[in-house]
Amino acid sequence: MLANRVERGRYFDSVALMRVARRIGALAGVEDAALMIGTPANKALLAQAGLLAPEGARAEPNDLVIAVRAAEPTAALELALRLLA
């Protein structure tokens, strides 16, 4: 199941986002994960990877998009937020 979560007005360094995405992607049951700022270019990359859901498509350039494809994405989305805190 594909799930996106948008955190409005949250900006993070791309290196930090890649580290969290790698940890989320390594979880059991997670097929793929990405965390990106909601710029048009980043949303295009998410779409090409098959990770852009309607919620993520509505993200603005100052928003964080957390994208997860997993059997149960809720736990992965929540862990991503905790790791960024």
What are the functions of these language-model segments?
Residues M1-A85:
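Non-catalytic terminal accessory/regulatory regions of metabolic enzymes
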